[in-house]
Amino acid sequence: CIAILTACSGGKTSKNADGTPSTLKSRYLGYYRSDTDNATYFDETTNEFDFDVNKSTISDGTEIESHIKTYQVLSEDELASNFKGQAEKNKGEIKNTDTAVFYIGLISDDRNGNKDGKISVDEQRSVYQIILSNNGNSIKILSLGDDWDQFAFTGTAKD
């Protein structure tokens, strides 16, 4: 299984080595809303998401190893067509101008990387759109196009 994350911004946002906006914080606390009870990759009861930009990993704060996922940042142009409509709809609802939007693809443990290191369009399964605002102090994580893992996480940065 692979989930995808890409990066885009209204302005010029500097990037971390993994392609995420430099305003991304390492830990967010908040609340999780799921339209299903089938959270595939993360614990449905989570109130935390942690990012490690040096390892390109995201976790739900449970410290369960299977809930620590490696991701790859993709550009919006690299998204599979079935994800682009929902991504555009979500971007259209953004009111704050201090916003960075990016997408991540989760890489399964059994996946052999492509020669160019990119997740191909055919390998995209779950895609997560991440919206940062307030200089990265606020976050919204939305799943795109995966009927088994529909959720939204809203949170604020914590040290």
Task: Report residues per predicted region.
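Short, exposed beta-strand-loop hairpins at the edges of beta-sheets
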Residues: 120, 129-152
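Short, solvent-exposed coil/turn segments at beta-strand boundaries
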Residues: 20-27, 48-57, 130-139, 157-159
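Tryptophan-anchored aromatic micro-motifs
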Residues: 14-41
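Contiguous, well-ordered beta-strand patches that form the walls/edges
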Residues: 33-39, 57-132
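Bacterial signal peptide processing site
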Residues: 9-12
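A mature extracytoplasmic/lumenal domain signature
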Residues: 32, 55, 60-62, 143-145, ...
